[in-house]
């Protein structure tokens, strides 16, 4: 598995002329909830305009692209790791596990997997063979399939935080999405934590006296 600092779509021909899955994650930093990943195989005959790193897009644009990706992609799949798995494995290994779950859930086997960042887990095809994979630094702004994966993962997790906000409105999840903001710390100090919190994360451990 190689790591690239930059890579163009044309460069992909050096790796594969077949199906390419882009993979990205969201939610490594929050104190609460799953870490969410997505794997997307785009259809070259149905290009999607405006794909980019989800963090650089407005919420309205992400939502519109989410629907377009779901409609036009050959296939996509969300993978996740729970707070309990994060606490057991650590956030890095839980993220790798979630990525593996996303790729394993694709109903079309990719010939190449491209992962945003500087590392990639081992991906295995349905027949047990190891899939070729490469990590690409800032790939979510370089490779369309990774951009699409970042959008699917981001919108999915944000929606889950909205659901959590409806159940626990006193925490403000709809605004901070579970990240360690001042408002979130104040809510934790007043109301404590519940089972969706990541107990291995330092601010939560400190509150629980662990």
UniProtKB/Swiss-Prot annotation:
Protein name: Ribonuclease HII
Chief site of localization: cytoplasm
Binding site for a divalent metal cation: 24-25, 116
Originating gene: rnhB
Cofactor, free-text remark: Manganese or magnesium. Binds 1 divalent metal ion per monomer in the absence of substrate. May bind a second metal ion after substrate binding.
UniProt function note: Endonuclease that specifically degrades the RNA of RNA-DNA hybrids.
Cysteine pairs bridged by disulfides in the record: none
Subcellular location: Cytoplasm
Similarity annotation: Belongs to the RNase HII family.
Keyword Ribosomal protein: no
PROSITE patterns: RNASE_H_2
GO CC term (a single one): cytoplasm
Top-level enzyme category: hydrolase
Domain of life: Bacteria
One GO term (biological process): DNA replication, removal of RNA primer
Pfam families noted in UniProt: RNase_HII
Catalysed transformations (reactions): Endonucleolytic cleavage to 5'-phosphomonoester
Single GO MF annotation: manganese ion binding
Entry keyword set: Cytoplasm, Endonuclease, Hydrolase, Manganese, Metal-binding, Nuclease
């Amino acid at each position: 598995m190689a790591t690239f600092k930059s890579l163009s779509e044309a460069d992909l021909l050096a790796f594969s002329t077949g199906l390419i899955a882009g993979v990205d994650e969201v939610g490594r930093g929050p104190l609460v909830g799953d870490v969410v990943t997505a794997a997307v195989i785009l259809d070259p005959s149905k290009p999607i305009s405006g794909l980019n790193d989800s963090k650089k897009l407005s919420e309205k644009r992400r939502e519109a692209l989410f629907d377009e990706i779901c409609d036009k992609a050959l296939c996509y799949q969300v993978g996740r790791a729970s707070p309990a798995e994060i606490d057991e494995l650590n956030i890095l290994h839980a993220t790798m596990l979630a990525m593996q779950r996303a790729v394993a859930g694709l109903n079309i086997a990719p010939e190449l997997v491209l992962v945003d960042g500087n590392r990639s887990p081992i991906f295995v095809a349905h027949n047990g063979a190891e899939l070729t994979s490469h990590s690409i630094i800032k790939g979510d702004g370089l490779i369309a399939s990774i951009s699409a994966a970042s959008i699917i993962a981001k919108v999915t997790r944000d929606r889950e935080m909205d659901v959590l906000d409806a159940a626990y409105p006193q925490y403000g999840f709809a605004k901070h999405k579970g990240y360690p903001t001042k408002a979130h710390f104040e809510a934790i100090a007043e109301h404590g934590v519940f089972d969706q919190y990541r107990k291995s994360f330092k601010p939560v451990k400190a509150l629980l006296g662990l």
